[in-house]
From Swiss-Prot:
Protein name: Conorfamide-Sr3
Entry function: This peptide has moderate activity on some voltage-gated potassium channels. It reversibly inhibits the Shaker voltage-gated potassium channels (Kv) from drosophila (Kd=2.7 uM). In addition, it also irreversibly inhibits human Kv1.3/KCNA3 (IC(50)=24 uM) and Kv1.6/KCNA6 (IC(50)=2.7 uM) potassium channels.
This protein's record includes keyword Secreted: yes
GO terms for cellular component: extracellular region
Major localisation: secreted
Family: Belongs to the FARP (FMRFamide related peptide) family.
Superkingdom of origin: Eukaryota
Keyword Secreted set for record: yes
Disulfide bond sites: none
Residues found modified as Phenylalanine amide: F15
Subcellular localization: Secreted
Keywords in alphabetical order: Amidation, Ion channel impairing toxin, Potassium channel impairing toxin, Secreted, Toxin, Voltage-gated potassium channel impairing toxin
Annotated TM spans: none
Length: 15
């Protein structure tokens, strides 16, 4: 979602 670790949710980790 966003740049960085855990930018949005743990499910989308570094997506």
């Amino acid at each position: 979602a966003t740049s960085g670790p855990m930018g949005w949710l743990p499910v989308f980790y570094r997506f």
